[in-house]
């Protein structure tokens, strides 16, 4: 099966490079790389006591750095965490190309962030829909059953999957068999994510 790179606002997302939020040295290095997309991370790579400082640093990077042809996405914290809503508000106001939403659970959770961003775009005279959403759609079991619905939000232009958090939710002792092949549940989730993305042309 031929794989077609997912298009973002600045072109195909053939390569994505994660940058820990708040790590200026790694950010400066990332700007010199050939990745199509830089994902500035406020979630897993930032400890709780550094969340707010990292958010401020990432906002400064977005507003001051020259990304050139690189797409700038920011993975914010989950919306049900102590930092999620503040992340969404502050980062959207800084105007990246898009937000990466982890641990989405339903279409309502995606729509809520969409509405928040719409209000910020209006307040700042930004073209409606200019800030996209990329969903990590398989980190919670309940999300797997509404992938297509979540991806149907008009602001969503990317849908991806991950096994790590889902394995934790399931209490799985392993993700792969002895041959290194994903176990059935993870293969099902990965395929479901692909089908939902194609069905919604994201």
Give the predicted meaning of each segment.
Residues 1-202:
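Expand to "…catalyze enediolate/carbanion chemistry for C-C bond making/breaking, isomerization
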